[in-house]
């Protein structure tokens, strides 16, 4: 939730560009990136790197379908918490994204397969650092890496996952500028 307020009058948000029938899909945002194995880094983009999966998680993601979750797996791959008879058991983890739907909310641990619905729609891995950034609407050439230090996926994930999506920030900024301009 974003709250905008001004003691000078009501701030009106600019009209939405997207709605439930017209939106940016996962494919729109990341579909043009080169394929990547888990644990690999694209030699042309150090941010297009994916976390290495354990052998068990490799088996799990192979059985996951786009839009699916751990419920798609054979019983021998399920964790004890997923076998509860209550019907509960962390339904929003170990998911795989769908190409033609919007991305789920990107969190600080989106690069881990078991941390949400962050399985790549097609490739057997979690999202890369670059893919998370693109889904947050950062430009493709944006660098989170400090050339003087080796940044970890965790530190970059915190930057990306905690960020206000760039295009949302732009819409908020434009709304505030319009408000100030309209005041004269």
What does each of the following model-derived ranges do?
Residues 1-49:
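Flexible, glycine-/basic-rich loop-and-beta segments that form/coincide
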Residues 48-184:
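C-terminal target-recognition/interaction regions appended to catalytic cores
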């Amino acid at each position: 939730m974003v709250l905008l307020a001004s003691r000078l009058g009501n701030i009106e948000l600019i009209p939405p560009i997207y709605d439930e029938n017209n939106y940016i899909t996962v494919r729109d945002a990341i579909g043009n990136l080169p394929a990547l194995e888990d644990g690999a880094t694209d030699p042309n983009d150090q941010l297009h790197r994916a976390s290495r999966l354990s052998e068990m998680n490799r088996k799990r993601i192979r059985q996951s379908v786009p839009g699916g979750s751990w419920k798609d797996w054979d019983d021998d791959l399920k964790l004890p918490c997923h076998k509860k008879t209550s019907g509960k058991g962390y339904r929003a983890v170990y998911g795989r994204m769908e190409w033609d739907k919007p991305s789920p909310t990107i969190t600080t641990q989106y690069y881990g397969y078991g941390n949400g619905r962050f399985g790549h729609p097609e490739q057997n891995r979690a999202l890369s650092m670059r893919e998370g950034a693109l889904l947050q609407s950062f430009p493709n050439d944006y660098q989170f890496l400090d050339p003087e230090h080796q940044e970890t996926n965790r530190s970059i994930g915190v930057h990306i996952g905690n960020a206000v999506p760039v295009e949302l920030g732009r819409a908020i900024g434009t709304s505030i500028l319009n408000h100030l301009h309209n005041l004269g």
